[in-house]
């Protein structure tokens, strides 16, 4: 498993039969702002994990992963299992069909600078999730209820976790 070093676009975009989530171009200026916000607040996320706050809820991070072919890349959410010397020990939550870069039950290490976004979903109140906020903003009003249900969203919060 190799993580992407640049902010290139995923080859796993939005399919016609999957209206809820869409591929966002990595050159989108709003996405750049969202990723910057996530990076600036990542220490709060890590502090919450270390302190055991919200420990009954999954702590997840988003990163870019390369497949066997370096042209094969995907930006996905993975579960934070533990911290090791400042790095994040993670495992996949869902692997896109056909993606060869990750295996179920695989553990891997992400450096903090590889994290694109982070999230804690506490009974529908989402801490972080800056790329999700943008994805929801880009979703039509008709699709927002489905989007919210899919991610279990009640509201976003800007409070520290």
What are these regions (language model features)?
Residues 1-161:
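Mixed-charge, low-complexity intrinsically disordered regions
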